[in-house]
Amino acid sequence: RGVLDGAHYVPAYWYSKSPAASLFGTGPCFGWSAQEMLGWIHYGGGIELFNELMGSLGLNLVSFFNSPMPAQPLGWFKSHITDSAQMKGMKYRTVGLAADVMNEMGLSVVQLPGGEIQPAMKSGLIDAAEFNNPTSDKDFGMQDVSKHYHLASFHQSQECFEVTFNKKKFDSLSSEQQHILRYASEAENSNFYWNNTLRYADDLISLKKDHGVNVYRTPDSVMADQLKAWDIVVDRISSKDPFFAKVVASQKVYAKKVMDYLLLNQPDYGLAYKHHFG
């Protein structure tokens, strides 16, 4: 409508317009991270599919994708989670396609904006929640309502930000100005990752040392169940939405090719970490 010239958010918030929109930021994991997903967007046909989606929705927008995020934690619980059965029936906060996945696993999902998560858990409206990372979670005060924080999850394991502009406004800019915005987005891609990885690490230390939070790695069995739930959700939506299926197929082609190389080539960095730090 032109009320704003530009905005900044995560693609998951497009979910109400089209489930396919969530595939551009919070979709299933095909062995890739947010870095490779952004590679698909920029070089694997993703941006063309996104523009096709925006056109079909009648949205007058131009978007750039940047800022690869580490996998989001499974989140905050009232006790240590050791298997998926413990989570069944829990009222759990998440958004986008992740809501479908966690529902499939037997949780009762409540979709809340970030600022309402901590009060909702404090009041008992929800039993557990995830938001994004140790820094944001700490800023929201999650350590005051839970002492059990679970890192690693496939519910939102590769997410990025979307910077969007009103298309009429963007098209009115000179070619030079348009390219400045495009390259600024690409520059932010690196700065975001470098800066925030350190922030998240510092705040995770603070959560443990200063606030007495117990930090766990989510069990592989839980993450395996998430992948199975993703399969069900993707198949169900794909059977009803040909464009959703088209995007998933494109992602799989890119991920299979790129990750075949990366997984064969990359050494086990965890092995080197343990060698030096135990």
Task: For the regions a language model picked out, list residue spans one by one.
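General nucleic-acid-binding
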Residues: 40
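Core domains of carbohydrate- and sulfate-ester-processing enzymes
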Residues: 44-45, 49-50
